[in-house]
C-alpha cells in the first residue's frame, strides 16, 4: 500500500509539473494578407491595415506625417504592454489631420499621413518591434503595417522627388 501511495504521489507531482500552454507560448495558426496587397496606393484614397489599427493617406508632396502614439483603440486581442512608455500623445491625430487639411486648403496639396490608431498601451510604433509589440502577434502585424506604409510613402517620394521630409508628430 505504501509503495502504491508513493507511486501515485510521484505520478501526480510529475504530471502537475508540466508546463501548461498559455496564449503567449502557443503557436497561433493565423495568416495575414501580404503587406502591400492593398496597393498600389493612390492619392485621394484612404487605406486601412487589419481591423483599421493603422490608417494611411497617400499624399502628393514630399512630406510624410507619422503619428505613432495618438490612437485610442484598445482591442482585447492585444494584451497591454508591460514595459516601456505607455502614455498617449493627446490630440496628435487631430493635429496631423489639421496639418494635412491646411496644406490642401492653402496649396491644393497634401502630405502623406500614417496613423497608429491603437492606444500606446497596446502598441508603441516608435520603438523596436520587441518593445513595441511585446510578442503579441496582432500588435506585431500593426507595427509591420505602420512601417510598411511609411516606407511605401518614402519610396514614392524618393522615386518622384529624390528627397523629402518626415515629421514624427508627438
Enumerate the predicted regions with their spans.
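C-terminal motif of bacterial Sec signal peptides marking the signal peptidase cleavage site
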Residues: 12-15
Amino acid at each position: 500500500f505504501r509503495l502504491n501511495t508513493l507511486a501515485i504521489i510521484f505520478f501526480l507531482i510529475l504530471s502537475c509539473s508540466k508546463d501548461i500552454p498559455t496564449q503567449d507560448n502557443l503557436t497561433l495558426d493565423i495568416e495575414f494578407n501580404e503587406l502591400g496587397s492593398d496597393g498600389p496606393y493612390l492619392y485621394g484614397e484612404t487605406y486601412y491595415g487589419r481591423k483599421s489599427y493603422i490608417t494611411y493617406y497617400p499624399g502628393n508632396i514630399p512630406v510624410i506625417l507619422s503619428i505613432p502614439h495618438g490612437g485610442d483603440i484598445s482591442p482585447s486581442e492585444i494584451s497591454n504592454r508591460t514595459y516601456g512608455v505607455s502614455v498617449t500623445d493627446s490630440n496628435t491625430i487631430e493635429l496631423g489631420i489639421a496639418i494635412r487639411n491646411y496644406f490642401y486648403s492653402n496649396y491644393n496639396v497634401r502630405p502623406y499621413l500614417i496613423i497608429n490608431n491603437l492606444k500606446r498601451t497596446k502598441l508603441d510604433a516608435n520603438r523596436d518591434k520587441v518593445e513595441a509589440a511585446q510578442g503579441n502577434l496582432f500588435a506585431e502585424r500593426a507595427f509591420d503595417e505602420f512601417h510598411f506604409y511609411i516606407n511605401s510613402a518614402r519610396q514614392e517620394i524618393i522615386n518622384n522627388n529624390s528627397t523629402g521630409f518626415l515629421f514624427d508628430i508627438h
